[in-house]
């Protein structure tokens, strides 16, 4: 009899657990709201955009939904949208997920929120028609693959960016000029790999590291001035480029093998560094 009662109690507890589980799922689902093509949530008096299914081509994302400020956009919220041509994001946004606009193939221009300090992982990856994006003075970091494959992007001015991540501009085949400013320190691995039209790069005083394969395959790159603060030149960082003349400053104490491998146009190289590694 005791065993039967114990079994019955277990069944009751299991049933209660299942009911609780379904209640939690239902409660979570009930937190979604829908307005003008936006799916969003509300929490602590603030709105987060989960996704957008509208058909607008020129989109101004609202700063307020359901009377609450829009402060966040979740990962992939606009990804693979073939309709979008231009987007204005409100400056109320303080956080974004990854791949928010990835593979938006017809996106040409974007106003990026002033309140963000970075461009997140794969935010614009595969946006083949993107030609215009504002990089405000608040942006300090460009994360990995943020603009990878943006084949129509031609020019970049990065006023306060301190570092760029791996593959951040890889395969941007129309990119011809990039300007960095005071405070910049780090060029990530393969960040400009196969930017075949890149001709002009300005690396300011303060730049310390050019990482692996950073400019590999930049066939049009003929000249680059290395700042006197440069310390690390990583392997293959200028492999297969069009460099003609280089001067490596005394500040370079860590230069790895194959930095200038297959630079077939290289006519003159002056090396003043102190240590060669690898």
Where are these regions (language model features)?
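N-terminal secretory signal peptides that target proteins for export/translocation
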Residues: 1-7
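Bacterial N-terminal signal peptides
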Residues: 12-23
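Structural signature of tandem-repeat unit edges
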Residues: 37-45, 54-71, 82-95, 104-118, ...
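Short, flexible turn/loop "capping" segments at secondary-structure junctions
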Residues: 52-53, 125, 148, 193, ...
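Consensus positions within tandem repeat domains that build extended binding/scaffold surfaces
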Residues: 74-77, 97-100, 120-123, 143-146, ...
């Amino acid at each position: 009899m005791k065993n039967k009662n114990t079994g019955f109690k277990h069944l009751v507890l299991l049933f209660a657990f299942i009911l609780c589980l379904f209640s939690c799922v239902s409660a979570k689902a009930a937190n979604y709201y829908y307005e003008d093509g936006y799916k969003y949530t509300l929490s602590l008096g603030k709105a987060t955009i989960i996704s957008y299914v509208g058909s607008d081509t020129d989109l101004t994302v609202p700063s307020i939904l359901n009377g609450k400020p829009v402060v966040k956009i979740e990962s992939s919220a606009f990804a693979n949208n073939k309709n979008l041509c231009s987007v204005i994001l409100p400056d109320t946004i303080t956080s974004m997920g990854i791949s928010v606009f990835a593979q938006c193939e017809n996106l040409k221009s974007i106003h990026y929120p002033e309140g963000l300090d970075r461009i997140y992982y794969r935010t614009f990856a595969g946006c083949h028609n993107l030609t215009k994006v504002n990089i405000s003075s608040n942006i300090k970091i460009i994360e990995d693959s943020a603009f990878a494959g943006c084949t129509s992007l031609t020019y970049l001015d990065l006023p306060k960016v301190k570092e760029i991540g791996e593959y951040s501009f890889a395969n941007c085949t129309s990119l011809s000029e990039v300007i960095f400013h005071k405070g910049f320190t780090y060029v990530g691995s393969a960040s400009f790999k196969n930017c075949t039209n890149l001709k002009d790069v300005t690396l300011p005083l303060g730049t310390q590291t050019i990482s692996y394969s950073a400019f590999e395959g930049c066939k049009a790159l003929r000249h680059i001035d290395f700042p006197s603060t440069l310390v690390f030149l990583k392997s293959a960082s200028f492999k297969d480029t069009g460099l003609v003349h280089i001067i490596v400053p005394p500040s370079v104490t860590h230069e790895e093998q194959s930095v200038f491998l297959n630079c077939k146009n290289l006519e003159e190289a002056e090396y003043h560094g102190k240590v060669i590694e690898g």
